[in-house]
Amino acid sequence: MSSGVERDARSLPWYRQVDADQWRAFWATFLGWVLDGFDFTILTFILIDIQESFTIDRALAGALGTVTLLMRLVGGAAAGTAADRWGRRLPLMLSILWFSLFAGLSGFSTSYAMLFAFRALFGIGMGGEWAAGMPLVLEHWPVHLRGIASGLLQGGYSWGFILSSVVFTFVYPVLTPYGELAWRTMFWLGIGPALLVLWIRKRVPESPVWLERQRHLKETRRPDGVSLLRIFRRDLLPTTIQCSVLIGSFMFSYYSITFWYATFLRERGQTTLSYLVALNVGGILGSYVWGRASEGRPGRRGAATVAALIGVGMVPLYLYATSPGLLFLGALLMGFFGAGMWGVVPTYLSERFPTSARGVGAGFSYHAGAALGSLTPFVVGAFQDRGWALPDAMATCIVGALLLSTGMLWLGPETRGRRLLALDGE
């Protein structure tokens, strides 16, 4: 009987197979990730202003991005451990409040050192939001729709980038006559996401998989056993290492594509909005397409590999096109392939770890990868300080990281179709 009901459900469009609680869990994490993306990417538009305000070189400006990515590891590990022990919702809410606070405080910085500290603290909240939110959604959604959920969720970061692009284009120019107030206001807008917490607290349910595990532990009087050290034990250590290096290569490629792109466009004399929208619309569409493709024959690894290799081929069009039309096309296609391959990441990482370590395992691996990739803004900036043209520095990093990504994907198992059970791995 249950199989017949399942077949009837699958005959519906996929979005009608998702119930209200599952959608609320999705929107909570998705909107948090959109706003997280806005708060991080707005920095890329105002690096030149920050250089001028604090009289720093490009390497130090890039280090503001680097320290944020490094500190995401702290947030991912802490919130992931908390999510496995106390549930997914509470760490998600606290992480959103945390990154909103320090995004806003960044606008009050009176020195480079103060701004550096605030961006480091912002990174902790940014890491926590992903670590708690992704398991919340993927443990709610049906197993056969997890790839779609993954792609839609990860595309939220691109929506955040579009939002920061629009705000910079239309709000920033109004404030430029007021000097430093312009770039400081871009940071102050980042406090807005804190309002999302009120809705999450009232409307978003806890993960049913996590709740089932807690019921079982209570009935059997077993200790919880949740610990950061769990992912470094013999059974999970290879998974933790492979996933961390994999995400590091993904991060290095993504930030090579995006972090200095607004500066690249300004140096080319182009208005940034249309190209950044193209890049991120490509990322949104690509995340959905490759996430959905990962549910089919290619699997998680195959879908991401195809996207990455085609992304390598898009580099000349993305960085060296001579006409605005071709430059626009390059942005769209690089987004679709080079950024779109991220659509498989949330579900792949969630499927690699058991429920007892899913938050901390996926969160730590994702943000350990971010820490490895955190060198990207600094490296690209350092190449320029040594005489490299910005397109050459970006291209070298993009190609190298995408090729490394394809190799790392195949060092781990295929996970498509793996069920997320309350007691898996115990």
Residue ranges of predicted features:
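Helix-to-loop junctions at the C-terminal end of transmembrane segments
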Residues: 76-87, 287-299
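Conserved MFS/SLC helix-loop-helix module at the cytosolic interface between two early adjacent transmembrane helices
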Residues: 74-110
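Glycine-rich segments within core transmembrane alpha-helices of 12-TM secondary carriers
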Residues: 147-172, 193, 366-377
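C-terminal transmembrane helical hairpin of 12-TM major facilitator-type secondary transporters
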Residues: 299-345
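Cytoplasmic membrane-interface "Motif A"-like loop-to-helix N-cap segments
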Residues: 85-95, 296-308
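Helix-breaking motifs and short loop linkers at transmembrane-helix boundaries and internal kinks
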Residues: 55, 87, 108-114, 142, ...
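Extracytoplasmic gate region of multi-pass secondary transporters
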Residues: 44, 235-284
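Cytosolic juxtamembrane N-terminal segment immediately preceding the first transmembrane helix
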Residues: 1-38
